[in-house]
Amino acid sequence: MNKKNLTICSFCGRSEKDVEKLIAGPSVYICDYCIKLCSGILDKKPTSTPTSGASTEAAPQHPDLQVLTPKEIKKHIDQYVVGQERAKKTIAVAVYNHYKRIRALLNNKHVSYGKSNVLLLGPTGSGKTLIAKTLAKILDVPFTIADATTLTEAGYVGEDVENIVLRLLQAADYDVARAERGIIYIDEIDKIGRTTANVSITRDVSGEGVQQALLKIIEGTTANVPPKGGRKHPNQEYIRVNTENILFIVGGAFVNLDKIIAKRLGKTTIGFSDDLGDFSQKDRDHLLTKVETEDLIAFGMIPEFVGRFNCIVNCEELSLDELVAILTEPTNAIIKQYIELFSEENVKLIFEKEALYAIAKKAKLAKTGARALGMILENLLRDLMFEVPSDPTVEAIRIQEDTILENKAPVIIRRAPEAIA
């Protein structure tokens, strides 16, 4: 039979040679495989995972979506994120408006304002990712993180942008309705600017193609997501996910963006150094509060992409005091975690104040912000965590400033022999 004359299923594309039965209707055909698939969907209970991404289908299931106020959102973030007061307030308002909009849509109310996608500027380790993670936790919505540098447009080797939606769907246990109200955080977004140099020959060097591909899912589309990920191919099954109400938060360091802003403002009129490369960190942080859409476009982001983020806010570089606070104050502070680990061995772990500041100084020199704190403490305590479980004589360990700065051994306080027995 001529291949051109083969009859195919109008839904999956299988030909009559590949199926057992092909049932004809008015101008359409459906195969036995698709009939079984549809039958299985209809047999499912109404509370099971939806197979369509349409938000209107999910509305009856969640008529009373609870929305925290901006103050409540910030209060929860404060428990985990130190500093960044301006960023936390701005994001709290944006998130409140976003989920208020979703609640109105679920209750079939007319909504004239768009969703509040967020663009976070700031150096590595300033808390951008942690803010996004904390938001998802307190709002009890699915959350996933993607790295923009691994994404490619269609036709290039790399990760398809729609796989980000798949990861969110997986985080929602394949509950489409929940995924459609989740949060996606895309890190390193500045690395796909058109001016970014990239020597790879397997992807779009300019980054514009990746921005265009992301634009579609950020502005709102029905994504056909392969359940198992990977590239799309003919005759593949898809899960349809509507991205219109997914909150997108993107973050990046945007190195040298401050110079672009200073050039636009006129450096001599704002009191900065005559040398554009001689800004202090305080100067850079201040300049980033003045960022405009045109600055991001000059950096290399396309206008359409920037236009989808009506909330643009910067996270400032963390001070020494803030780094020390990160070590000790949050609910899940890393010092608290190590103290608990040693307490399970009946050992008291003590950090002197000077030692905490020494750790903060070391982290600041590493230029990776709060991210360096965990590595410094791991390297510091690794040998102790190896030895202590086998040594019942250890009662307490005192970490001093010279332990950090001069690599001197910590002070070990031992139990009296009679206390060991």
Swiss-Prot record:
| Keyword hit for Zinc | yes
An example Gene Ontology biological process: cell division
Q: Does the keyword rRNA processing apply?
A: no
Q: Which residues belong to any copy of the ClpX-type ZB domain?
A: 1-50
Positions contributing to ATP binding? 123-130
PANTHER family with a match to the protein in the record: ATP-DEPENDENT CLP PROTEASE ATP-BINDING SUBUNIT CLPX-LIKE, MITOCHONDRIAL (PTHR48102:SF7), ATP-DEPENDENT CLP PROTEASE ATP-BINDING SUBUNIT CLPX-LIKE, MITOCHONDRIAL-RELATED (PTHR48102)
Q: What is this protein called?
A: ATP-dependent Clp protease ATP-binding subunit ClpX
